[in-house]
Regions:
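Core segments of cupin and vicinal oxygen chelate
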Residues: 3, 10-52
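Vicinal oxygen chelate
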Residues: 5-14, 61-151
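Short, flexible helix/strand-to-coil boundary loops that buttress conserved ligand/catalytic motifs
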Residues: 23, 82-85, 128
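Conserved beta-strand in the GNAT
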Residues: 52-57, 125-128
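A short beta-turn/loop motif at secondary-structure boundaries
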Residues: 34, 60-61, 106-108
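Short polar/acidic secondary-structure junctions
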Residues: 46-47, 59-61
Length: 151
C-alpha cells in the first residue's frame, strides 16, 4: 500500500548479548528477548506509543550478512551525535568519500547524516530531514557546504 509506514526492521548479529548491550547503549528500550529463538526486539522512538521496532537476530557467523538502516532524528539531535557516540566509544564512519567531522548531506532528499557501525559491522545512520528544497545536482556534501548554498 502506498501510505503504509515501516513498523519494524531487522538486523543480524553473531553475538546477541553484545548486540543487546550496544543497542541499549544507544538508548533503545528492550521490548522483548526470546532466548530460545536468539532474538531481541527494541522499541524505536517513543516506546509508550509502540509504533516502531527493531529486531536483532543471532545467526551463525557464516550466515551473517551486514545490513543498513537509519534512525530519524531532528537537526538539533543530529548535531549532538558525535559527542553521544564518542562518550560510548563508538566511532563515526567516513561516508561517500567525506570525513566524519560533520554531517554529510544527501542533497536530493535533502537530509543530513552521520554514519557508524554496530559491533557486527551493520551500517547505522542518524538522519535528519532538512527544510530546504532538494538540490540533487549537489550530490553529497558536508552540512557546512550545504548551508553556504542558502546564504
Amino acid at each position: 500500500m502506498k501510505n503504509a509506514e515501516l513498523y519494524e526492521t531487522h538486523v543480524k548479529t553473531v553475538n546477541l548479548e553484545s548486540a543487546v548491550a550496544f543497542y541499549k547503549s544507544l538508548g533503545l528500550e528492550l521490548a522483548y528477548l526470546l532466548e530460545e529463538r536468539r532474538v531481541a526486539f527494541f522499541y524505536l522512538g517513543d516506546s509508550e506509543k509502540k509504533q516502531q521496532m527493531l529486531g536483532v537476530w543471532e545467526v551463525k557467523e557464516h550466515e551473517f550478512v551486514p545490513s543498513h538502516f537509519a534512525f530519524k532524528v531532528t537537526v538539533e539531535q543530529l548535531r549532538s551525535v558525535p559527542q553521544l557516540l564518542e562518550a560510548k566509544g563508538i566511532a563515526l564512519s567516513p561516508s561517500f568519500g567525506l570525513h566524519a567531522s560533520e554531517p554529510v548531506v544527501h542533497a536530493w532528499m535533502p537530509a543530513a547524516c552521520y554514519y557508524f557501525s554496530d559491533p557486527d559491522g551493520n551500517s547505522l545512520e542518524y538522519l535528519a530531514l532538512l527544510d530546504q528544497e532538494p538540490k540533487p545536482e549537489l550530490g553529497v556534501l558536508h552540512l557546512s557546504e550545504w548551508e553556504k548554498t542558502f546564504q
